């Protein structure tokens, strides 16, 4: 499917009716087991929503559907008024402004905390841009603000593989924040964290 690239820009998401995410009548089955059964969920632009339930309730599956990792058997999923997420690839969905943190942190372990944020920040991922482009003052400020927000200023030059589990969780959240997504999905963000890390 060909997606109009202009629709993938954050500022073009049509939320005039308030909702940024529409999930309607979504069903997902795995070998006869219904992980989601006729799910309806509406999230307004700027709204904070927590989905709580036991293991196996379908929370991760719902996020998989929104991010294109899993296709629903039935139902519709829209980002804003016009982007049908069921017809888009994972890349297109991420590029449209939906960020996701998985249960298990995925960071570049051999790079520093700062380098992880820098890699996440760049929108153009071609090899030459990644190797030779210098950060603008605004991008440096974004990284510094994010380091402060996630509590990793002192660890900025520490390799990510040496961080404690909770710090790694925060780093991955920071990697999403520097991308400035319009919708952020975070799966079990405090799993394995100590009281001090949360």
Question: Predicted segments — roles?
Answer:
Residues 2-198:
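Glycine-rich phosphate-binding loops of nucleotide-dependent enzymes
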């Amino acid at each position: 499917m060909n997606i109009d690239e202009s629709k993938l820009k954050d500022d073009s998401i049509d939320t005039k009716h308030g909702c940024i995410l529409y999930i309607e009548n979504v069903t997902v089955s795995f070998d006869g087991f219904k992980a989601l059964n006729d799910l309806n969920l509406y999230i307004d632009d700027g709204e904070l929503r927590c989905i709580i339930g036991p293991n196996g309730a379908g929370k991760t599956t719902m996020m998989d559907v929104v991010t294109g990792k899993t296709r629903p058997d039935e139902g519709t999923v829209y980002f804003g008024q016009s982007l049908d997420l069921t017809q888009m690839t994972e890349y297109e969905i991420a590029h449209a402004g939906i960020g996701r943190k998985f249960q298990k942190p995925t960071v570049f372990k051999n790079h520093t905390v700062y380098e992880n944020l820098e890699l996440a920040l760049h929108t153009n991922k071609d090899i030459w841009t990644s190797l030779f482009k210098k950060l603008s003052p605004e991008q440096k400020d974004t990284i510094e603000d994010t380091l402060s927000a996630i509590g990793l200023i002192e660890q900025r030059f520490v390799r990510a593989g040496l961080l404690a589990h909770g710090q790694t969780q925060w780093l991955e959240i920071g990697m999403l924040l520097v991308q400035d997504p319009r919708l952020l999905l975070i799966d079990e963000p405090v799993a394995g964290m100590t009281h001090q890390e949360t």
